[in-house]
């Protein structure tokens, strides 16, 4: 209590500029309580565990102050300076921070939850593991975090349309934006363009975060059916140099004409022979990756794409199409539905067939090529490089009446050299539920 009384006595002393001078003092655990705290200098003071309980703090200076565990139970901080202030676990939660300069401060593990932040500066700050959950950055002026350490900082569902994150440290940074300001926004173009610019200011080592933010923005615009040439052109310009421009969700929004071309091309060639060029392979693989339901509607098209892409000389195309194929094959968890009836004969285990089982009919892409009936579990095993699976004497059908045994390995299945023009690869699978097989046969 003595320290509190002592601190209050200092409030009576003002300097020539009308400021109350509380500089270079040990004010540990003081409790400042009142209506308005105005024109007070806490320059280089020790404010550890201090509580400010008032309606407003205005025109105050906390430069180089020690502020560990300081609590600001205020409605508003206006025109306040925290330059080079240092301390952890400072609580600004639910305050209005209006024209507050935090530049060069060290405020790790601090709490900015649900703050309304206007015209404030966070340049060169150390904000390790601080929380801005549901904070609102409301100023028309850009909120700046240039060169700040934002490691493990949580910007969770923040309302934010302007910001500069240039040269920040962003390891483990989490940033999600509340897009509620899209609704009834009189300057929607400006709002969207500012967000696009803000995303672009994030450093290149935060590419995954930039990608997520860009995709979520585009998804929000697509859900609301907001299409505007102005900010679409801005996206093309700003995002064009970044890898996430290739994300199918973004491309389908800013290059919607490409989707139409894809759909038209696929419809036209659904039942005909197609020779894909390199760019078509890339585009169509991306399209199927994001819209796997298209596969069942475009089986012939998909067969040929898989075939030609796996034979491509482009390693990236081969890797992407192999990933697409494996993901698609593994999309259903299915039990084995074959039993051994003789040494080299497998047949359907009808006792094991359920409505949830899939039987895959596997085709070669060449004319009159072999066809195989197999359970998806066999394919799962085949595609598992860590599992030593014996594929001897699986029955391959060149027709319903002619059976040819073959040793089915990854080499015989996917290497065009092993069977010449009758190579078994690619597996193209059309899956039928087991009850269809039982009803219709194979």
UniProtKB/Swiss-Prot annotation:
Gene3D superfamilies reported in the protein's UniProt record: E3 ubiquitin-protein ligase SopA, HECT-like ubiquitin ligase, Putative secreted effector protein
InterPro entries for the chain: 5peptide_repeat, Pentapeptide-BTB/POZ_domain, SopA-like_central
Record-linked Pfam families: Pentapeptide, SopA
Top-level division of the source organism's lineage: Bacteria
Note: The sdgG mutation, which suppresses a conditional mutation in dnaG (DNA primase), has been localized to one of the ubiA, ubiC or yjbI genes.
Listed name of the protein: Putative protein YjbI
Organism: Escherichia coli (strain K12)
Gene it is expressed from: yjbI
């Amino acid at each position: 209590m003595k320290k509190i009384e002592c601190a209050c006595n200092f409030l009576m002393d003002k300097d020539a500029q009308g400021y109350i001078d509380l500089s270079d003092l040990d004010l540990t655990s003081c409790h400042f309580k009142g209506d308005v705290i105005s024109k007070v200098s806490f320059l280089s003071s020790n404010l550890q565990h201090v509580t400010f309980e008032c309606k407003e703090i205005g025109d105050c200076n906390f430069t180089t102050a020690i502020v560990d565990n300081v609590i600001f139970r205020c409605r508003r901080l206006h025109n306040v300076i925290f330059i080079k202030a240092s301390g952890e676990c400072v609580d600004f939660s639910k305050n209005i921070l209006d024209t507050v300069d935090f530049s060069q401060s060290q405020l790790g593990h601090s709490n900015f939850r649900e703050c309304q932040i206007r015209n404030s500066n966070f340049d060169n700050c150390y904000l390790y593991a601080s929380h801005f959950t549901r904070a609102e950055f409301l100023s028309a002026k850009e909120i700046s975090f240039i060169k700040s350490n934002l490691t493990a900082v949580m910007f969770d569902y923040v309302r934010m349309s302007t910001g500069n994150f240039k040269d920040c440290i962003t390891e483990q940074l989490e940033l999600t934006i509340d897009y509620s300001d899209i609704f009834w926004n009189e300057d929607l173009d400006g709002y969207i363009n500012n967000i696009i610019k803000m995303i672009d200011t994030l450093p290149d080592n935060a590419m995954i975060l930039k990608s997520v933010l860009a995709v979520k923005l585009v998804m929000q615009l697509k859900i609301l059916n907001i299409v505007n040439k102005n900010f679409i052109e801005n996206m093309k310009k700003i995002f064009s140099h970044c890898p996430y421009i290739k994300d199918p969700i973004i491309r389908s929004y800013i290059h919607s004409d490409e989707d139409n071309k894809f759909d038209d091309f696929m419809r036209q060639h659904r039942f005909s022979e197609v020779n894909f060029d390199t760019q078509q392979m890339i585009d169509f693989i991306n399209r199927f990756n994001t819209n796997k339901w298209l596969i069942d509607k475009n089986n012939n098209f998909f067969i040929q794409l898989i075939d030609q892409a796996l034979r491509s000389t482009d390693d990236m195309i081969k890797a992407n199409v192999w990933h697409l194929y494996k993901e698609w094959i593994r999309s259903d968890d299915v039990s084995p539905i074959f039993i051994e009836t003789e040494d080299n004969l497998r047949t359907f285990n009808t006792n094991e067939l359920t409505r949830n089982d899939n039987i895959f009919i596997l085709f070669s892409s060449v004319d009159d090529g072999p066809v195989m009936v197999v359970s998806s579990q066999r394919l799962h095993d085949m595609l598992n490089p860590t599992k030593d699976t014996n594929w001897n004497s699986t029955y391959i059908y060149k027709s319903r009446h002619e059976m040819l045994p073959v040793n089915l390995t990854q080499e015989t299945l996917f290497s065009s050299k092993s069977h010449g023009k009758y190579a078994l690869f690619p597996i193209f699978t059309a899956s039928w539920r087991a009850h269809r097989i039982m009803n219709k046969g194979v």
